[in-house]
Protein backbone atom coordinates (compact mmCIF):
# COMPACT_ATOMS: atom_id res chain seq x y z
CA UNK A 1 0.00 0.00 0.00
CA UNK A 2 1.49 3.32 -0.95
CA UNK A 3 1.59 6.47 1.15
CA UNK A 4 -1.35 8.25 -0.49
CA UNK A 5 -3.71 5.27 -0.25
CA UNK A 6 -2.83 4.80 3.44
CA UNK A 7 -3.59 8.49 4.13
CA UNK A 8 -6.94 8.28 2.36
CA UNK A 9 -7.89 5.15 4.35
CA UNK A 10 -7.01 6.89 7.64
CA UNK A 11 -9.09 9.89 6.59
CA UNK A 12 -12.13 7.82 5.66
CA UNK A 13 -12.12 6.03 9.03
CA UNK A 14 -12.00 9.35 10.89
CA UNK A 15 -14.71 10.90 8.71
CA UNK A 16 -16.99 7.93 9.32
CA UNK A 17 -16.77 8.51 13.08
CA UNK A 18 -17.45 12.24 12.68
CA UNK A 19 -20.49 11.55 10.50
CA UNK A 20 -21.94 9.22 13.14
CA UNK A 21 -21.59 12.00 15.73
CA UNK A 22 -23.22 14.53 13.41
CA UNK A 23 -20.47 17.09 13.91
CA UNK A 24 -19.64 20.14 11.84
CA UNK A 25 -16.14 19.47 10.49
CA UNK A 26 -13.10 21.68 9.96
CA UNK A 27 -11.42 19.84 7.08
CA UNK A 28 -7.77 20.47 6.23
CA UNK A 29 -5.99 19.53 3.02
CA UNK A 30 -2.35 20.30 2.37
CA UNK A 31 -0.09 20.19 -0.64
CA UNK A 32 3.61 21.05 -0.69
CA UNK A 33 2.81 24.59 -1.80
CA UNK A 34 -0.65 25.38 -0.33
CA UNK A 35 -3.01 24.58 2.53
CA UNK A 36 -6.80 24.58 2.37
CA UNK A 37 -9.40 24.62 5.17
CA UNK A 38 -13.18 24.23 4.94
CA UNK A 39 -15.94 24.13 7.53
CA UNK A 40 -18.43 21.53 6.29
CA UNK A 41 -22.02 21.03 7.50
CA UNK A 42 -22.90 17.84 9.41
CA UNK A 43 -24.70 16.39 6.37
CA UNK A 44 -21.50 16.81 4.32
CA UNK A 45 -23.18 18.54 1.42
CA UNK A 46 -22.56 22.20 2.20
CA UNK A 47 -19.38 24.23 2.74
CA UNK A 48 -20.14 26.84 5.39
CA UNK A 49 -16.78 28.64 5.45
CA UNK A 50 -13.48 28.24 3.64
CA UNK A 51 -10.01 29.74 3.38
CA UNK A 52 -6.82 28.78 1.59
CA UNK A 53 -3.42 30.13 0.64
CA UNK A 54 -4.51 30.51 -2.99
CA UNK A 55 -6.74 33.46 -2.01
CA UNK A 56 -5.35 36.86 -2.94
CA UNK A 57 -6.05 38.28 0.54
CA UNK A 58 -3.86 35.63 2.18
CA UNK A 59 -1.13 35.70 -0.48
CA UNK A 60 -0.65 39.40 0.21
CA UNK A 61 -0.15 38.76 3.95
CA UNK A 62 2.52 36.04 3.67
CA UNK A 63 5.82 35.75 1.84
CA UNK A 64 5.53 32.02 1.04
CA UNK A 65 2.33 29.94 1.04
CA UNK A 66 3.77 26.55 2.00
CA UNK A 67 4.92 27.20 5.57
CA UNK A 68 3.55 27.29 9.12
CA UNK A 69 3.04 31.06 9.12
CA UNK A 70 0.76 30.83 6.09
CA UNK A 71 -1.13 27.94 7.70
CA UNK A 72 -1.68 30.02 10.84
CA UNK A 73 -3.14 32.87 8.75
CA UNK A 74 -5.51 30.41 7.02
CA UNK A 75 -6.58 28.99 10.41
CA UNK A 76 -7.32 32.43 11.80
CA UNK A 77 -9.33 33.50 8.74
CA UNK A 78 -11.39 30.29 8.47
CA UNK A 79 -12.22 30.55 12.19
CA UNK A 80 -13.34 34.17 11.80
CA UNK A 81 -15.53 33.25 8.82
CA UNK A 82 -17.06 30.32 10.73
CA UNK A 83 -17.79 32.48 13.78
CA UNK A 84 -19.51 35.04 11.53
CA UNK A 85 -21.88 32.25 10.43
CA UNK A 86 -22.55 31.29 14.06
CA UNK A 87 -20.43 28.12 14.16
CA UNK A 88 -18.57 27.86 17.45
CA UNK A 89 -17.70 24.16 17.78
CA UNK A 90 -16.25 21.86 15.12
CA UNK A 91 -14.59 18.46 14.84
CA UNK A 92 -11.06 18.73 13.42
CA UNK A 93 -10.68 16.56 10.30
CA UNK A 94 -6.97 16.40 9.45
CA UNK A 95 -7.63 14.25 6.35
CA UNK A 96 -5.16 11.57 7.40
CA UNK A 97 -2.24 14.00 7.69
CA UNK A 98 -0.09 13.93 10.83
CA UNK A 99 -1.02 16.49 13.48
CA UNK A 100 2.31 18.22 13.09
CA UNK A 101 3.79 21.24 11.36
CA UNK A 102 1.39 23.15 9.12
CA UNK A 103 -1.68 21.13 10.15
CA UNK A 104 -0.95 21.84 13.82
CA UNK A 105 -0.31 25.56 13.14
CA UNK A 106 -3.66 25.87 11.38
CA UNK A 107 -5.47 24.13 14.25
CA UNK A 108 -3.77 26.25 16.93
CA UNK A 109 -4.58 29.49 15.10
CA UNK A 110 -8.22 28.46 14.66
CA UNK A 111 -8.47 27.70 18.39
CA UNK A 112 -6.91 31.06 19.30
CA UNK A 113 -9.41 32.81 17.02
CA UNK A 114 -12.30 31.27 18.98
CA UNK A 115 -13.26 27.92 17.42
CA UNK A 116 -13.71 25.03 19.82
CA UNK A 117 -12.60 21.54 18.84
Curated annotation (Swiss-Prot):
Keyword Ribosomal protein in record: yes
- Identify a single GO molecular function assigned to this protein: structural constituent of ribosome
Which Pfam families does this chain map to? Ribosomal_L18p
- Name the Gene Ontology biological process terms: translation
What are the annotated GO cellular component locations? cytosolic large ribosomal subunit
- Keyword set, alphabetical order: Ribonucleoprotein, Ribosomal protein, RNA-binding, rRNA-binding
CDD domains recorded? Ribosomal_L18_L5e (cd00432)
Q: What the protein does?
A: This is one of the proteins that bind and probably mediate the attachment of the 5S RNA into the large ribosomal subunit, where it forms part of the central protuberance.
Task: Return the similarity comment.
Answer: Belongs to the universal ribosomal protein uL18 family.
Q: How does it assemble?
A: Part of the 50S ribosomal subunit; part of the 5S rRNA/L5/L18/L25 subcomplex. Contacts the 5S and 23S rRNAs.
Q: What is this protein called?
A: Large ribosomal subunit protein uL18
